C-alpha cells in the first residue's frame, strides 16, 4: 500500500507506508518552513501516535525547536490552541475516519488552518530535500508539557462564550444526550462540553482507546449502537464524531440517523434565523454539499458560495469573501468566531441551542428542513474512461456545468458531481435530487456514459 497524500495531509498503514523515517522527514520539512516559535504536537487515540510524537519531539529538540506535547486532543482543539497561543504551527497524528491500523499527519499552519495547495507543494519539495534522519526516544526530551485537559478546557470555554450560544437557555432545557465518540479524541471534550451546558450525558464508545468500537466514519450505517442507546435511554438527541473530532453526525430522538449532511443544514438554519447580521455574509460550502444548506440560505436572502472539496478550500474562500459560517456536508461546521476549521464541539453547541430556542424535538426540526436525497457511488478509473469529462459534457450539453473540481452538472433541484478521488484510483459520483430513486438514476446515467 502506497502512502496516500491529499489536501488534508498524508495517511498510510502504520509501520508500513507510514514509518518513523518518513514521519521525521516530514516533521523536519514542516519545521523548516514554519516561522520561529513553538510547534504543537497532538494525536487521536491510535497508540502509534504516541510513538510518532516522541520521535518528533526528539528531532525538533535537536534542531532547536521548542515543542508543545498536547497528546490526545481533537483536531479542532489543536487548531484553536495554535491560534490562541500564537504557536508557529502544529502536527496532528490522525488518519481521521480510516481504520485503526492506519495513521497519518495533518499539518496546521500558524493561522490554525490546514496547508493550502501551494503550502503543501512546498512541504513536499522540502521533504524531498530532507535526508533520512535518525531519532531516538531515549534521550532527555526538552518539551513544554501542555496538559491536554488544559487545551480542551480552553477550547470548551471558547465555545461556551460564543455570541451565538445562549448557555443558560440550553441549561434550562436539561437535554438528555447520548454521545458516541468512537473512543477517539473527543471522548473527553464532547461530554465535558455537554455537561457544561447542563445536559444529562450518556456515553458509549467514549474512552480513549484505539479499538474504536464501531466503524470510525460517523455515517448512518455505522451508528446502530447510538440509535439503540438513544431509544433505550429515551434521549433527546444523539451525537457521533469521527476519531479526530472534526465531523459531527446526529441521531434523532426516535433513534433515526439524520445523515451527516443534516448537521450543517441545522446550523445554517439556526444562525440565519436568529442572527440577522450573519445574513450579510455568504455561507461557503463545497461542491458536494447538500442543497439543504443552499435552500435555507436562499430563504434568508443570504449569498451562498461553493468551492472545490477540501476544508482548506472552503476556509480560503471564507477568508476571501468575509464569510462567518461555512463547512462541508460530511458533518463539518466552520464558525469563524471560534476558528477556521471544522469543529464537532461548535456544531453540537449550535444544534443544542437550536433545540432549546425552538422548543420542539429534533425529529420535528429535521422534518421542517428542505428534503433532498444524496446518493454516492464510485467506479474504477481505467484507461478507457480517463477522458470521461468529454463524454459527460457532451451528454449534458444543455445543462450548467461547473468544472472547478471535476465536473458538476447542475439542474433545478438536482445535481451530479463526478471527480477523481485524491486517495484512490476511482471516480467518485455523487448525486442529489428530491427523491431517492431519482438520485440513483442520475448516478446510473453517469456510469453508463463512462463505460
Label each residue range with its predicted role:
Residues 1-66, 88-89, 142-177:
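An N-terminal, well-structured beta->alpha segment
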Residues 121-157, 161, 253-329, 334:
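Proline/glycine-rich low-complexity loops and linkers
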Amino acid at each position: 500500500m502506497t502512502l496516500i497524500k491529499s489536501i488534508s495531509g498524508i495517511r498510510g498503514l502504520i509501520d508500513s507506508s507510514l514509518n518513523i523515517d518518513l514521519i521525521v522527514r516530514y516533521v523536519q520539512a514542516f519545521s523548516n518552513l514554519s516561522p520561529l516559535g513553538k510547534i504543537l504536537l497532538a494525536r487521536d487515540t491510535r497508540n502509534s501516535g504516541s510513538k510518532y510524537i516522541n520521535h518528533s519531539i526528539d528531532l525538533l529538540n535537536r534542531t532547536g525547536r521548542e515543542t508543545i506535547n498536547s497528546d490526545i486532543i481533537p483536531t479542532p482543539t489543536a487548531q484553536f490552541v495554535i491560534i490562541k497561543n500564537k504557536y508557529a504551527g502544529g502536527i496532528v497524528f490522525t488518519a481521521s475516519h480510516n481504520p485503526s491500523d492506519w495513521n497519518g499527519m495533518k499539518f496546521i499552519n500558524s493561522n490554525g488552518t490546514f496547508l493550502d495547495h501551494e503550502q503543501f507543494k512546498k512541504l513536499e519539495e522540502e521533504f524531498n530535500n530532507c535526508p533520512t534522519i535518525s531519532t531516538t526516544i531515549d534521550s532527555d526530551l526538552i518539551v513544554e508539557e501542555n496538559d491536554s485537559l488544559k487545551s480542551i478546557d480552553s477550547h470548551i470555554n471558547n465555545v461556551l462564550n460564543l455570541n451565538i450560544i445562549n448557555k443558560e437557555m440550553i441549561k434550562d432545557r436539561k437535554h438528555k444526550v447520548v454521545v458516541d465518540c468512537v473512543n477517539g479524541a473527543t471522548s473527553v471534550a464532547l461530554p465535558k462540553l455537554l455537561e457544561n451546558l447542563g445536559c444529562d450525558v450518556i456515553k458509549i464508545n467514549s474512552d480513549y482507546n484505539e479499538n474504536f468500537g464501531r466503524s470510525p466514519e460517523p455515517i448512518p450505517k455505522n451508528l446502530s449502537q447510538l440509535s439503540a442507546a438513544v431509544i433505550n435511554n429515551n434521549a433527546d438527541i444523539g451525537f457521533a464524531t469521527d476519531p479526530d473530532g472534526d465531523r459531527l453526525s446526529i441521531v434523532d430522538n426516535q433513534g433515526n440517523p439524520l445523515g451527516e449532511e443534516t448537521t450543517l443544514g441545522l446550523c445554517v438554519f439556526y444562525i440565519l434565523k436568529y442572527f440577522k447580521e450573519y445574513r450579510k455574509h455568504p455561507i461557503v460550502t463545497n461542491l458536494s454539499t447538500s442543497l439543504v444548506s443552499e435552500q435555507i440560505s436562499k430563504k434568508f436572502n443570504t449569498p451562498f458560495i461553493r468551492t472545490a472539496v477540501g476544508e482548506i478550500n472552503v476556509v480560503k474562500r471564507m477568508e476571501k469573501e468575509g464569510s462567518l459560517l461555512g463547512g462541508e456536508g460530511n458533518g463539518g461546521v466552520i464558525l469563524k468566531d471560534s476558528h477556521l476549521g471544522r469543529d464537532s464541539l461548535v456544531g453540537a453547541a449550535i444544534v443544542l441551542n437550536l433545540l432549546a430556542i425552538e422548543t420542539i424535538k429534533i425529529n420535528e426540526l429535521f422534518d421542517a428542513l428542505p428534503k433532498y436525497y444524496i446518493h454516492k457511488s464510485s467506479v474504477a478509473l481505467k484507461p478507457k474512461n480517463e477522458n470521461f469529462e468529454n463524454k459527460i459534457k457532451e451528454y449534458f450539453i444543455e445543462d450548467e456545468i461547473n468544472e472547478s473540481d471535476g465536473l458538476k452538472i447542475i439542474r433545478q433541484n438536482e445535481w451530479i458531481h463526478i471527480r477523481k478521488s485524491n486517495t484512490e484510483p476511482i471516480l467518485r459520483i455523487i448525486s442529489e435530487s428530491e427523491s431517492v430513486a431519482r438520485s440513483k438514476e442520475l448516478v446510473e446515467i453517469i456510469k453508463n456514459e463512462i463505460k
